[in-house]
Amino acid sequence: MANRTVKDAHSIHGTNPQYLVEKIIRTRIYESKYWKEECFGLTAELVVDKAMELRFVGGVYGGNIKPTPFLCLTLKMLQIQPEKDIIVEFIKNEDFKYVRMLGALYMRLTGTAIDCYKYLEPLYNDYRKIKSQNRNGEFELMHVDEFIDELLHSERVCDIILPRLQKRYVLEEAEQLEPRVSALEEDMDDVESSEEEEEEDEKLERVPSPDHRRRSYRDLDKPRRSPTLRYRRSRSRSPRRRSRSPKRRSPSPRRERHRSKSPRRHRSRSRDRRHRSRSKSPGHHRSHRHRSHSKSPERSKKSHKKSRRGNE
């Protein structure tokens, strides 16, 4: 029959694996449409295809207690009892989150306390969102790590009573389980180590090397340079100045006025030079004396006439 457990199935927690689900809920599952149409004749390989089609998790819902496909596949896995390696691959699957949730619930129902902590605690680092259907048939939003936390600490998940789980600290004291290290602690350790490395690098940069000390030594006998030459202020060019930098500045008209010599001044200077050159030459003195003392005949006639008129 379709509702019987396989012959070579092992008892779990001293009982038939299907009996881990309550009889009322188990009966509702056997009578559901999904169980009769989709779960008939399924094997461990075919369960994977059905698990990939899941879109939400949940137990039973509605007034007449209808089971969800997630709950039906859970009971089917208890019935066929797949190998542990297949369940571990379900849990490690990162592409399909509902396949992972199905494997986690089955591991919690059938696995030992050590296996539950070993395979389920790493899923605390999965923060993906999943849909959950409540008793009223409404969908709620939750995360993968919340679902894992309920599996490890709650008594009932998806309307299934979970087996008792041994406390973690008891297993740690018995040295059967190592203390759990969360991903947050690992990140904090990485941050602290990186900060320590940065501080060490800064200290090494602050400590001057012997070469630097030799360079910084100053001879007291040598005269000290003026601070203006040493600490020369660099002019910061504005964008406007940068644009004008390739072109050379034209001299201001005021400077040009001082530099340029006026023609009048130039003439006077040239005359002085000529006069000096003539005064130095001996011929110039003679000609000058001759011009100053000797009179022309016309000029002498005019002076003679003027003297005559004065006498008359």
Curated annotation (Swiss-Prot):
Coiled coil: 170-204
Pfam families: PRP38, PRP38_assoc
Basic residues bias spans: 225-294, 301-312
Compositional bias (Acidic residues): 184-202
Segments for region (Disordered): 181-312
Modified residues (Phosphoserine): 11, 193-194, 209, 226
An annotated GO cellular component: U2-type precatalytic spliceosome
Region (N-terminal protein interaction domain): 1-179
Subcellular location(s) of the protein: Nucleus
Keyword Metal-binding in record: no
GO MF terms, alphabetically ordered: RNA binding
Effect of residue 145 to A: Loss of interaction with MFAP1
InterPro entries: PRP38 (IPR005037), PRP38_C (IPR024767)
Subunit structure: Component of the spliceosome B complex. Interacts (via N-terminal interaction domain) with ZMAT2 and MFAP1.
Family classification: Belongs to the PRP38 family.
Function of the molecule: Involved in pre-mRNA splicing as a component of the spliceosome.
Name of protein: Pre-mRNA-splicing factor 38A
Organism per entry: Homo sapiens (Human)
High-level lineage: Eukaryota, Metazoa, Chordata, Craniata, Vertebrata
